[in-house]
Amino acid sequence: MAVPFRRTSKTRKNKRRTHFKLEVPGMVECPECGEYKLSHRVCKACGTYKGEKVASK
């Protein structure tokens, strides 16, 4: 079975993991109630989407 010659250093390990991170979701302010919501989705607070009442609370 193949094994590495040397132990992977902390620096090399961290350089490899630079792209391994969480991204912040795209939050926007609802134009109707001012609550923060995910873009292109119905507002959970007031139930509107693109200025129309879609869901009832």
Swiss-Prot record:
SUPFAM superfamilies recorded: Zn-binding ribosomal proteins
Keywords: Ribonucleoprotein, Ribosomal protein
Family matches, as Pfam families: Ribosomal_L32p (PF01783)
Biological-process GO terms, alphabetical: translation
The organism's place on the tree of life at top rank: Bacteria
Annotated GO CC locations: large ribosomal subunit
Signal sequence annotation: none
Matching InterPro entries: Ribosomal_bL32, Ribosomal_bL32_bact, Ribosomal_zn-bd
MF annotations from Gene Ontology: structural constituent of ribosome
HAMAP family linked to this entry: Ribosomal_bL32
Family: Belongs to the bacterial ribosomal protein bL32 family.
PANTHER family, sorted: 50S RIBOSOMAL PROTEIN L32 (PTHR35534), LARGE RIBOSOMAL SUBUNIT PROTEIN BL32 (PTHR35534:SF2)
Protein name: Large ribosomal subunit protein bL32
Organism: Shouchella clausii (strain KSM-K16) (Alkalihalobacillus clausii)
